[in-house]
Swiss-Prot record:
The keyword Ubl conjugation applies. Residues 130-203 are annotated as: Hydrophobic repeat HR-A/B. A motif (9aaTAD) lies at residues 408-416. The modification Phosphothreonine is found at T142, T323. It comes from Mus musculus (Mouse). SMART domains: HSF (SM00415). This is Heat shock factor protein 1. Its main location: nucleus.
Length: 525
């Protein structure tokens, strides 16, 4: 017990308690069997560590763990001394462990103050470690700042690209809208060009002709291009007189005009069975009246941009106007060319004053006279509806389907080098043969005296829907087609004799292709 108290009383006060206890433990002679000084006094030996931990350590320390005792020695700078025999392969016979410290010497207790714990060295290592870590953290922060700057740059670029993408989408939408508008404009231009091409190929009328749906008591104004011309050969000598104001509307539709022979083309405004039309360029004194045969004309499909025309056929013998011809019977008679039609025969003549003339030889089959062709309202309305539906279908095709137009093809339409088969024009020979066949077998030829004996012959009106005249050169027309109007070939055929002079008649010059040179009539607007 004194040994335990002794160490607390001995030694200086600034020596650590572990060192004081260790000095007392080593210097105690009662424990020399387990712990004691070395013979030199520079170190101490610990024998039988197990027994030492069980019997000695609990007396001086709060534990009996040999490892903790060795760790405490290392903290104060004690080192384990290793001998040569302990480093061999043979285990030593005695368990002996020696520890030494330069300041822990036998008989020199005052040197215990120099023994310190290794706190300073540990703090130095920690500071160096902290400095190294600080450098690493600084480098990491620098790298993070660089990455942050690059990330901000990428964000700005992405934002700019997003704005540019939105601007591009808006521009694409605007361009699509403009493209749609331009496509509509192009479609309208194509329709306009097609209408121009059709108007250049077809002789147009300046204004629409009113429909003959009902009789009208008041006569309408005469069209600008309404004029009369004959389709048959004029017998007898005598040229046409010079054109006069007879082409005006007042003289053309006057009841006092002189009656002449030959088919007349004009506009029918009302039914006038007792008022025949006048021939524009002749008088009774200049030319005798001649008879003509009834003209059967096939009804061709009308051209959509123009109104139908009406042909007035004037046979040499006047006929009675008792039974008008219905359009259905007239069309059936046209289809049956070989069969006699009720409208092909002529009856007793009747002049404008109602006096009966001597009867002339007539065909064996009695036929009714050809009166004014009365248009059926239902048939005409059906025809107009069909035309409207065709125009609507064409407009739908042009507007709904996108297509491209070759400008060279449009320019070729105006070029004089274009061939007629490309334009699908009708056949001249077949059409001319058909009209001559219709003109010739109607009645046998009569002498000129019989024609002159009937000065006052009436006219019969024939409903005729003609194709509009094409403004083309007859010399350049290809006769291989099958649908061209027969009026082209009249100027080249032998229908007119070479001795007759028709240069003064504008209608004949229109058929022959020669334009008469005359001053413009001031009455024609």
């Amino acid at each position: 017990m004194d040994l335990a108290v002794g160490p607390g009383a001995a030694g200086p006060s600034n020596v650590p308690a572990f060192l004081t206890k260790l000095w007392t433990l080593v210097s105690d002679p009662d424990t020399d069997a387990l712990i004691c000084w070395s013979p030199s006094g520079n170190s101490f030996h610990v024998f039988d560590q197990g027994q030492f931990a069980k019997e000695v350590l609990p007396k001086y320390f709060k534990h009996n763990n040999m490892a903790s005792f060795v760790r405490q020695l290392n903290m104060y700078g004690f080192r384990k001394v290793v001998h040569i025999e302990q480093g061999g392969l043979v285990k030593p016979e005695r368990d002996d462990t020696e520890f030494q410290h330069p300041c822990f010497l036998r008989g020199q207790e005052q040197l215990l103050e120099n023994i310190k714990r290794k706190v300073t060295s540990v703090s130095t290592l920690k500071s160096e470690d902290i400095k190294i870590r600080q450098d690493s953290v600084t480098r990491l922060l620098t790298d993070v700042q660089l990455m942050k700057g690059k990330q901000e740059c990428m964000d700005s670029k992405l934002l700019a690209m997003k704005h540019e993408n939105e601007a591009l989408w808006r521009e694409v939408a605007s361009l699509r809208q403009k493209h749609a508008q331009q496509q509509k404009v192009v479609n309208k231009l194509i329709q306009f060009l097609i209408s121009l091409v059709q108007s250049n190929r077809i002789l147009g009328v300046k204004r629409k002709i009113p429909l003959m749906l009902s009789d009208s008591n008041s006569a309408h104004s005469v069209p600008k291009y309404g004029r009369q011309y004959s389709l048959e050969h004029v017998h007898g000598p005598g040229p046409y007189s010079a054109p006069s104001p007879a082409y005006s509307s007042s003289s053309l539709y006057s009841s006092d005009a002189v009656t002449s022979s030959g088919p007349i083309i004009s506009d029918i405004t009302e039914l006038a069975p007792t008022s025949p039309l006048a021939s524009p360029g002749r008088s009774i004194d200049e030319r005798p009246l001649s008879s003509s045969t009834l003209v059967r004309v096939k009804q061709e499909p009308p051209s959509p941009p123009h109104s139908p025309r009406v042909l007035e056929a004037s046979p040499g013998r006047p006929s009675s106007m008792d039974t008008p011809l219905s359009p259905t019977a007239f069309i059936d008679s046209i289809l049956r060319e070989s069969e006699p039609t009720p409208a092909a025969s002529n009856t007793a003549p009747m002049d404008t004053t109602g006096a009966q003339a001597p009867a002339l030889p007539t065909p064996s089959t009695p036929e009714k006279c050809l009166s004014v062709a009365c248009l059926d309202k239902n048939e005409l309305s059906d025809h107009l509806d069909a035309m409207d539906s065709n125009l609507d279908n064409l407009q739908t095709m042009l507007t709904s389907h996108g297509f491209s137009v070759d400008t060279s093809a449009l320019l070729d339409l105006f070029s004089p080098s274009v061939t007629m088969p490309d334009m699908s024009l009708p056949d001249l020979d077949s059409s001319l043969a058909s009209i001559q066949e219709l003109l010739s077998p109607q009645e046998p030829p009569r002498p000129i005296e019989a024609e002159n004996s009937n000065p006052d012959s009436g006219k019969q009106l024939v409903h005729y829907t003609a194709q509009p005249l094409f403004l083309l050169d007859p010399d350049a027309v290809d006769t291989g087609s099958s649908e061209l109007p027969v009026l082209f070939e009249l100027g080249e055929s032998s229908y007119f004799s070479e001795g007759d002079d028709y240069t003064d008649d504008p209608t004949i010059s229109l058929l022959t292709g020669t334009e008469p040179h005359k001053a413009k009539d001031p009455t024609v607007s």
